[in-house]
Swiss-Prot record:
One of its GO terms (cellular component) is cytosolic small ribosomal subunit. This is Small ribosomal subunit protein uS3c. InterPro entries: KH_dom-like_a/b (IPR015946), KH_sf_prok-type (IPR009019), Ribosomal_S3_C_sf (IPR036419), Ribosomal_uS3_bac-typ (IPR005704), Ribosomal_uS3_C (IPR001351). Residues 39-118 form the KH type-2 domain. It comes from Cuscuta gronovii (Common dodder). Pfam families: Ribosomal_S3_C.
Amino acid sequence: MGQKINPLGLRLGTNQDHYSIWFSQPKAYSKSLQEDQKIRSFIRNYIKNMKISPSGVEGLARISIYKRIELIEVRIFLGFPKLLLENRPEGLEELQITLQKELNCGNRRLNILITKVEKPYSNPNILAEFIAGQLKNRVSVRQAMKKAIELAEEADTKGIQVQVAGRLNGQDIARVQWIREGRVPRQTIRATFDYCSYPVRTIYGILGIKIWIFVGEDK
């Protein structure tokens, strides 16, 4: 069996940055790691509960965390920030206050920034959310994948591979289906990728969605 590595982890330190940037003493490391997990889970649940988009695509690309001695800076990368801010203008301030209480920051300030993703459908997390919404609405797997690839091509991606695994279309035996368009050099270390692995719960069980998007290549 082939051993499959996470393409983002493989490229850390070459052309991929960490999503959390901070330093900690060895004894306090696990506590800081749990704090990061709590921040990400809280923000994801907050955006999910707001139900900002009728299509079911929340548009959350990623959450980056930067920590200093007196400051925690959280950057939320959203594909559709207008929906969040128009739906609830005071939402960002409310999120900041609630999260600060949840974390028990003490003397540290919490600062939340929202950054817009210029081409939302060039991000694998947003595309995976779109496919998950289609599968929940009983659209066939092949059709959902093809539509996602069309959206990615409109966003000028250089290459994309979409894979869905599980009981596809309610079949008794679990299968894997994938489609690739353009160039996807997964073995090349200098090739920059965006990647996500996204589970979706359907009436037939849990399906796994994986998306690789080829961004470019370092010279």
